[in-house]
Amino acid sequence: YVHDNSSRGIGGGMYVDGHNSNRRANIINSRIENNVSLSESGGGLYLGSYVNVVGCNIANNKSISYGGGIYASSNNNIINCNIVKNTSAFGDGIYGNPTVTNCIIWGNDDSQIYSTSSTSSVTYSAVQGGYVGTGNINLSALNTGEGIHPKFTNPTEGVGPDYSGGDWTIQDGSAAINKGKTEG
């Protein structure tokens, strides 16, 4: 659980850089919440190259510049994660060019994903406002009610590190249930 941290540089919660494609860094089943990058990028996570982020909850983080939830350089994989209620100047949820699969990207301050390349790959993910890619779902800005919504158990009311205590598990009836890609 990485929470309530701040950095005067990059990576408010964590700054991670893998070595190469044969020695990837892994962040697995972690909560990265309520962190702040005060002058640079990556409020929750700053990912250099060759990092896998799997099964994580990245919520209520803030960056002054790029990537409120995640700033991703190159050759990064984000799989089975919730990226929710983050804020920044550019790319409130994700900024960069990662490969994103089976994620819920919702409720971030303005832009859910700010891609820095035309080769960005987002697939089998539920994204507020939609995102072009195979198997993606266009989520409503509302958590419940009319439209296609994520139906989180208890989301925070606001975005950024001033809000905490959300329960980001999805309930029965969520538009995201059984919509991801199964491996194997």
Language-model-derived ranges and their functions:
Residues 1-173, 177:
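Predominantly extracellular beta-rich ligand-binding scaffolds that present long acidic/polar faces
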Residues 181-184:
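Extracellular calcium-associated, cysteine-rich motifs in secreted modular proteins
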